[in-house]
Each structure stands twice: as C-alpha cells, then as structure tokens.
C-alpha cells in the first residue's frame, strides 16, 4: 500500500507541479489539480482529444464472436499497455455493432464499475475494438497520449467520484469530456514522461523485491510448519 501511495504521489506531483520547483504557480481552479506552473494551460479533456465509446456485438449470434479482432472489456483496463484481450470478435461482429477499431496509443477509460474499476485507464498496444463501458481517448497533436495517461492516473479518485454524484453511478462521455487536464508545453510533457518512466521503473523494481521476499518468507514458514507437524523438528523445550 505504501508503494502504491508513493507511486500515486509521484505521478500527481509531476503532472500538476512539473519538475522545476522554482517556477511561479497559479490556481488551476480545478479541484484535483490545485496549483500549476503559471505558464501551463488547463484544458478540458474533450478539448484535447476525441472521445468515443464502443459496443458489444449480439451475444446470441455466434458468427460475431471468436474472430481475429481484439475486443476490450473494462476489467482488462488496469494501468497497463493492452497487448491482448480475453475475447475477440469477427468482421461481422464489428460491422453489426457500435464498436470500432481504435489505434495503438489510444487511451481507454473504464466508465462503468462498482468496485475499483470505474475511472481506471490503460493504453492500447494493439489495434482493438472495445465495449460500450469504455471510453476511447485519442489525443490531439497538442498533447502526448502518455502524458495525458499519467494525468488520468493521477486524477483517478477524483474521476471515480464523478460517477457518484446524485444518482449517476457510471461515468459517461459528457462527464469524461469535462475532466480538466494540466497542459505544459510539449517539451515539458516529454521531460515529465521520461522522468516518470525512470522513477516508476525504480518503484517497480522495489515492489518486485518486496514481493519476492514475501514469497520466500511464506515458503519458509510453510516448510517450517510441515517439518514441525511431521515430527522433523522437536519443538519441546529443552530441560
């Protein structure tokens, strides 16, 4: 949990405050962003990108399923690069539903989900179709998709809560398009991306070491218990 909090704090600080601690700041007038460098813009996601939803081919029509076209569900959106999918559809399924093929680099956001799913994002590593619970975000030339991806990672809790207002349980295109994003100049976006890639790789390495240590402890504990209950170890106190 501490590593997750560290990761979230690292991303949030980089995409809202930048890497230069000496620049003057101003109020962004956005709840999740707070203050931003004075020379940055703050724009709605809908202004910076084209946002679309997908669809689901008729489940009752077997000719629409088990084809060659990857089809993404919200459960597969989990802050990763999507390189494969659990299900695939056919050309007929694509033609006879609201989905379409989004290009690699497109950001997908999960709009539905009562658990932790709603508000999560991922980046397509392959051309893929997707269901109506996903929003496909194709960035304009003024922003880098990976920078926007990190912004949406940072805004996860804020975005998730947008789906809780009044009786609105899920997100929709209107809500997603109004999300505010801090926009530094392109060069700074590149610098922030490089910085985050390097720092997150370090955190990943630490997380892997911790996971390996926990696994080793569990193995040794299991081996000790087995040895104790089978009489291989004398647990009686020595006289």
Give the location of each predicted region.
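Short amphipathic coiled-coil heptad-repeat segments
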Residues: 1-38, 209-239
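Short, Lys/Arg- and Gly-enriched loop/turn segments at beta-strand edges
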Residues: 116-123
């Amino acid at each position: 949990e501490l590593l997750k909090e560290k990761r979230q704090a690292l991303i949030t600080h980089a995409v809202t405050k930048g890497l230069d601690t000496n620049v003057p700041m101003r109020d962004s007038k956005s709840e999740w962003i707070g203050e931003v460098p004075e020379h940055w813009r703050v724009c709605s996601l809908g202004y910076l990108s084209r946002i679309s939803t997908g669809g689901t081919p008729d489940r009752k029509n077997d000719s629409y399923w088990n084809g060659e076209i990857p089809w993404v569900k919200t459960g597969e959106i989990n802050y990763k690069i999507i390189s494969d999918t659990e299900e695939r559809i056919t050309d007929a399924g694509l033609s006879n539903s609201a989905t379409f093929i989004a290009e690699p680099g497109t950001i997908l956001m999960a709009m539905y989900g009562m658990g932790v799913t709603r508000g999560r994002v991922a980046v397509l590593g392959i051309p893929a179709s997707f269901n109506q619970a996903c929003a496909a975000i194709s960035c304009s030339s003024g922003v880098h998709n990976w920078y926007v991806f990190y912004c949406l990672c940072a805004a996860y809790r804020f975005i998730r809560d947008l789906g809780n207002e009044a009786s609105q349980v899920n997100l929709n295109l209107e809500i997603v398009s109004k999300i505010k994003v801090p926009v530094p100049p392109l060069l700074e976006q590149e610098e922030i991306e490089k910085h985050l890639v390097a720092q997150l790789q370090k955190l990943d390495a630490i997380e892997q070491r911790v996971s390996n240590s926990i696994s080793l402890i569990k193995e040794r504990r299991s081996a000790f218990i087995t040895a104790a209950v089978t009489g291989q170890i004398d647990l009686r106190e020595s006289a």
